[in-house]
Curated annotation (Swiss-Prot):
Signal peptide: none annotated. Keywords: 4Fe-4S, Iron, Iron-sulfur, Metal-binding. It comes from Drosophila mojavensis. InterPro entries: Cytosolic_Fe-S_CAF (IPR050340), Fe_hydrogenase (IPR009016), Fe_hydrogenase_lsu_C (IPR004108), Fe_hydrogenase_ssu (IPR003149). Belongs to the NARF family. GO terms for biological process: iron-sulfur cluster assembly. This is Probable cytosolic Fe-S cluster assembly factor GI11683. [4Fe-4S] cluster 1 binds at C23, C68, C71, C74. [4Fe-4S] cluster 2 binds at C187, C243, C395, C399. It comes from the Eukaryota.
Length: 476
């Protein structure tokens, strides 16, 4: 089995910007002086030797996540980069070590293992194993508990909080400067692209609200740790996500807690990696006893653990914020089902609200880098179509078609598979973020809404990455 997910490699997929072939991080290789020259042999498995009078195994070059985040040589995520701490192998190693510590009675070093599962991987795995989504969640929970999980959580509470924070942020920005477009922040592929390619020009437009993954990180490492009476560093937090970019997001310095001396999310695995782990064991989800997911946030759990947020597949930001802004800013009620108008392609759509003959709200959804690039060019030229808010996602069709979702198994076209996943999503119950659970988190943990604590824990900042000119960037 490969050291990392088989899909994590350079691709030439349409509408996907692959990383630069050159990494700008210089790596020093000690060379031996020779009058006759040396021969370097590279084996298929990556083992390579330098031979002259004998053989010398060369040092394996590893690029860490921090190198990748500080680099400006790539456009999107970690494709083609060896990510040593964000793989299924690293996860299984940690779980085995934890079980060994339990068996030896060394309780002081045992960690609490917490898994958080996003809705898109659940839908992908449900389709792969021909299960209902809630049923798949319970079987996956059973599988993860067998691996060593102490808690298995859904992202529902964080999805709700992200919408509440983002809508409030939009209303405040609109009142301060209605001409400044606000762009969503939950997609790390898009954020990475913005930081490295457009820098200080575009960063003021991006919402500061953290993604649901990172909000879950705060809740697990602080709120759950507090309830368990342990330090956040004693919790090993794993998330199951639909794309590899989430691995980079979890490794940002912004999401390292000095209070806990640990990252809010320790490890990210993806839908396809879960499938590979099951394939390695020659198992299916159905073979694991179902187990209820945990709900440690309030005394009374919700009716279900897997929820949809609006009708779009990437968190429902554009829809939810549009409805809230129309009501909050203009006292206008909108239909439950909004009708976004597709423009040049199905991955770019818009909706607007008119009042007294004037467009007062104009929202858009832009999925895929082709549409993102077009949007950026219009903003830079000052010829933007006047959008007040744009939900931006790097993947065509959004998170439901994330780059690490389970692949088609029968020669099925990706578009057809995506449509089937969308149908499963539409069958889920709709979450209303204004609920007793989020209110409890605000009052019991965040000292209320719009407080210094909520601002500190639920928001983040961005950093332009300076383009470096090195010899490795030169193309001969």
């Amino acid at each position: 089995m490969s050291r990392f997910s088989g899909a994590l490699q350079l691709t030439d997929l349409d509408d996907f910007i692959t990383p630069s072939q050159e990494c700008i991080k210089p790596v020093t290789i000690d060379k031996t002086k020779s009058k006759t020259g040396s021969k370097i042999t590279v084996q298929a498995d990556g083992y390579y030797e330098e031979s002259e009078s004998g053989k010398q195994k060369l040092q394996k070059v590893e690029i860490t996540l921090q190198d990748c985040l500080a680099c400006s040589g790539c456009i999107t995520s970690a494709e083609g980069v060896l990510i040593t701490q964000q793989s299924q192998e690293e996860l299984l190693k940690v779980l085995r070590e934890n079980e060994r510590l339990k068996a030896s009675g060394d309780s002081d070093k045992v960690r609490t293992i917490v898994f958080t599962i996003a809705v898109q991987p659940l839908i992908s795995l449900a389709h792969r194993f021909e299960l209902g989504v809630e049923e798949a969640a319970r079987h996956l929970s059973g599988y993860l508990r067998q691996l060593g999980a102490d808690y298995v959580l859904s992202t529902k509470i964080a999805d709700d909080l992200a919408l509440l924070e983002c809508r409030q942020e939009f209303v405040e920005r609109y009142r301060d400067n209605a001409d400044l477009s606000m762009l969503s922040s939950s997609c790390p592929g898009w954020v990475c692209y913005a930081e490295k390619t457009h820098g200080n020009f575009i960063l003021p437009h991006i919402a500061t609200t953290r993604s649901p993954q990172q909000i879950m990180g705060v809740l697990v490492k602080q709120r759950l740790a507090e309830k368990l009476g342990v330090s956040g560093s004693r919790i090993y937090h794993v998330t199951v996500m639909p794309c590899y970019d989430k691995k980079l997001e979890a490794s940002r310095e912004d999401f390292y807690s000095e209070v806990n001396s640990s990252r809010d999310v320790d490890c990210v695995i993806t839908s396809i990696e879960v499938e590979q782990m099951l394939q390695t064991e020659e198992q299916t989800l159905q073979q694991f006893a179902p187990s209820d997911m945990d709900w440690p946030w309030t005394d009374q759990p919700p009716e279900a653990m897997v929820w949809a947020h609006e009708s779009t597949m990437s968190g429902g930001y554009a829809e939810h914020i549009y409805k809230y802004a129309a009501r909050e800013l203009f006292n206008e009620e909108t239909p439950n089902e909004l009708q976004f108008k597709a423009l040049r392609n199905r991955d770019f759509s818009e909706i607007s609200l008119e009042k007294d003959g004037k467009i007062v709200l104009k929202f858009a959804i832009a999925n895929g880098f082709r549409n993102i690039q077009n949007l950026m060019q219009k903003l830079k030229r000052g010829k933007g179509p006047g959008y007040h808010f744009v939900e931006v996602m790097a993947c065509p069709s959004g998170c439901i078609n994330g780059g690490a979702q389970v692949r088609p198994t029968t020669g099925q076209h990706v578009r057809e598979l995506t449509q089937q996943l969308e149908e499963l999503y539409k069958q889920l119950p709709r979450s209303n973020p204004d609920n007793a659970h989020t209110k409890h988190i605000y009052t019991d943990f965040l000292d209320g809404t719009q407080t210094d604590k909520s601002q500190s824990l639920l928001h983040t900042s961005y950093h332009a990455v300076e383009k470096l000119n090195t010899a490795l960037n030169i193309k001969w």
